[in-house]
């Protein structure tokens, strides 16, 4: 959605987008508010299949021993990632694999330096164009090594690696019936079962 700004009462000075974003989060619990390339975006509450797909992704990561306290990484949901594209820019990936010392990388507005992120993952919703386009550039510019997209609309899993200034150099697309291997740099050898993830993310009717 378009950028949102507000004026200070009695002045012509615009409020920082961060202040607007924080107020929106207070008023809309459960909604995801982000600032990407200077644009404020608001994603609605996730549905059940979105959460089911996310759980299905997490299970093999946890089964591989990630985030068990003995590894160098943690698997986390919904933490803020500071973006270099603007002074207030940040994103909130659905899932992240971060260095175990991520607390040492806390920056402003409860976000974390992208240097501690090994992987980010988005499960698409109605804002799938943001995940498939704008966030590709945003995460690449932040030099996040791996970006995974669960595209529920088209029933595919995208694995993007090798970030460049305008996007990722490698972009692999996997369909149901295939395994989507993740780079060992995340901390373990893990492949995602695309069929299981796509079925989990489909409407339950």
PLM segments and residue spans:
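Gly/Pro/Ser/Thr-rich low-complexity, intrinsically disordered segments predominantly at protein N-termini
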Residues: 1-119, 123-142, 146-205
């Amino acid at each position: 959605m378009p950028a949102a700004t507000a004026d200070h009462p009695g002045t012509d000075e615009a409020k920082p987008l961060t202040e607007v974003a924080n107020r929106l989060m207070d008023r809309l619990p459960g909604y995801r508010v982000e600032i990407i390339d200077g644009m404020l975006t608001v994603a609605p509450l996730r549905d059940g299949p979105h959460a089911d797909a996310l759980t299905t992704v997490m299970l093999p990561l946890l089964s591989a021993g990630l985030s068990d306290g003995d590894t160098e990484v943690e698997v986390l949901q919904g933490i803020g990632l500071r973006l270099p594209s603007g002074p207030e820019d940040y994103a909130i990936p659905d899932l992240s694999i971060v260095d175990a010392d991520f607390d040492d990388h806390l920056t402003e507005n409860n976000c974390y330096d992208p240097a501690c992120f090994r992987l980010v993952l988005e499960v698409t919703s109605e804002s799938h164009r943001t995940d498939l386009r704008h966030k590709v550039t945003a995460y690449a510019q932040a030099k996040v090594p791996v970006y995974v997209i669960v595209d529920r609309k088209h029933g595919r899993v995208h694995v993007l690696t090798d970030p460049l200034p305008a996007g990722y150099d490698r972009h692999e697309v996997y369909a149901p019936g295939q395994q989507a291997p993740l780079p060992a740099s995340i901390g373990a050898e893990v492949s995602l079962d695309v069929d299981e993830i796509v079925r989990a993310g489909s409407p339950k009717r």
